[in-house]
């Protein structure tokens, strides 16, 4: 594979850099680091992106997108990540494409334009207190009652469950079927009186929620795909999510650049610059190598997408490498920043307005978001390498 940007990709990257610099001024995300302000900043920015026509750059034109190639779509996500632009990744790259493939015409007509405009956002309702890694063990029930389902149950780690407009909800519609059967996908509005959630504060500085469903009535018309065949939709959506999480890992490239610049202008008591220390250069070099390898893997993934040849094991491999590279690079950058690294926003001497510390704490999320990395390794060994499947 020959890696060279086309003139169109170069123009797109240049246009995006100028646009994102105006949309999200330098260090804007750090200035909105308090959770409530983060969420308001996120929704405002997403609506602006939608009104300016920048959401869905890779969506087909028939659904209101720009119809750009996977390579050009990756350029968009790459530049957005490095500029610190928040994106509705679940709605844009997971739920939307799955509705395109499996949804009814009515569902497409209602949801897709609203996703592209930034009007609605989604949370993912998969994991449960007793069904996380083993997702097929989910128990949230949906009982058919005429033209509606009555939903009862609980989900956990429902990111954006307190701010999203809809939940992409996995429910069990046939309790007597085998674990991977009898699951259906429903579109559940969060303004239903039977929906509630509790915010969970995490050490990573990332809010998530536990969400509850008490006699929530969902029209059958809001079921995506056939009844009891939701597992196929879940795996389709998770492949999209794993690819998205890998692309999102390019945020570490910006962190590396910023820490390198900080080390070049910061002097020690003896007058030497931080970057003049041999071990610092080795750490920065190692981080560059890891991120360059991640970039090449991402482009290999994009090439497979363009050829419609992306396999589950390839998606898992890119997700594992990208998420672990991001975590490792942030750890190395924290070493370089030394005592100033752990300082949060607002503290005297905080590196990069506290963004480095926040990025270090949040990096761990990507190792289990979209599927725990240990499970991804099992997918790689079982499907990709033909090794015996792990027994559970």
Task: For the regions a language model picked out, list residue spans one by one.
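A short, Trp-centered hydrophobic/proline-enriched beta-strand micro-motif
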Residues: 118-126, 170
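Hydrophobic, small-residue-rich alpha-helical packing segments that form membrane-like cores
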Residues: 133-134, 149
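C-terminal helix-coil-helix/basic helical segment that borders enzyme active sites and/or dimer interfaces
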Residues: 28-36, 268-278, 292-348
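A structural signal for short hydrophobic beta-strand segments in well-ordered beta-sheet cores
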Residues: 140-143
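A short core secondary-structure module
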Residues: 147-148, 152-198
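Glycine-rich phosphate/cofactor-binding loops in nucleotide/flavin-utilizing enzymes
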Residues: 2, 75-76, 94, 231-248, ...
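Glycine-rich beta->alpha junctions and the first turn(s) of the following alpha-helix
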Residues: 3-7, 195-294, 366
């Amino acid at each position: 594979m020959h890696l060279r940007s086309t003139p169109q990709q170069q123009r797109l990257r240049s246009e995006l850099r100028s646009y994102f610099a105006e949309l999200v001024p330098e260090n804007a995300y750090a200035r909105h680091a308090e959770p409530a302000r983060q969420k308001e900043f996120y929704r405002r920015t997403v609506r602006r992106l939608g009104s300016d026509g920048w959401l869905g750059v890779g969506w087909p034109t028939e659904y209101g997108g720009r119809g750009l190639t996977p390579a050009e779509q990756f350029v968009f996500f790459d530049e957005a990540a490095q500029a610190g632009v928040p994106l509705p990744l679940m709605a844009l790259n997971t739920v939307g494409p799955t509705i395109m493939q499996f949804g009814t015409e009515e569902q497409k007509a209602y949801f897709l334009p609203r996703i592209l405009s930034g009007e609605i956002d989604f949370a993912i309702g998969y994991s449960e207190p007793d069904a996380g890694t083993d997702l097929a063990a989910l128990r949230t029930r949906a009982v058919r009652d005429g033209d509606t389902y009555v939903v009862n149950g609980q989900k956990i780690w429902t990111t954006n469950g307190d701010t999203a407009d809809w939940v992409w909800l996995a429910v069990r519609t046939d309790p007597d079927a085998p674990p991977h059967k009898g699951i259906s996908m429903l579109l559940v509005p969060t303004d239903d009186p039977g929906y509630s959630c509790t915010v969970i504060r995490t050490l990573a500085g990332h809010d998530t929620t536990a969400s509850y469903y008490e006699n929530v009535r969902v029209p059958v018309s809001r079921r995506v795909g056939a009844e009891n065949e939701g597992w196929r939709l879940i795996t389709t959506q998770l492949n999209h999510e794993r690819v998205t999480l890998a692309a999102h890992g390019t945020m570490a490239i910006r962190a590396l650049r910023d820490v390198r610049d900080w080390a070049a202008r910061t002097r020690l008591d003896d007058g030497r610059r931080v970057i003049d220390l041999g071990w610092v250069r080795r750490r920065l070099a190692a981080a560059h190598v890891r991120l360059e390898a991640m970039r090449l893997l991402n482009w290999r993934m994009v090439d497979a997408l363009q050829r419609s040849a992306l396999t589950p094991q390839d998606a898992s491999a890119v997700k594992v490498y990208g998420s672990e590279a991001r975590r490792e690079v942030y750890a190395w950058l924290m070493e370089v920043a030394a005592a100033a690294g752990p300082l949060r926003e607002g503290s005297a001497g905080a590196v990069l307005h506290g963004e480095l510390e926040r990025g270090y704490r949040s990096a761990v999320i990507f190792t289990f978001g979209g599927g725990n990395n240990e499970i991804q390794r099992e997918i790689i060994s079982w499907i990709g390498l033909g090794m015996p499947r792990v027994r559970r």
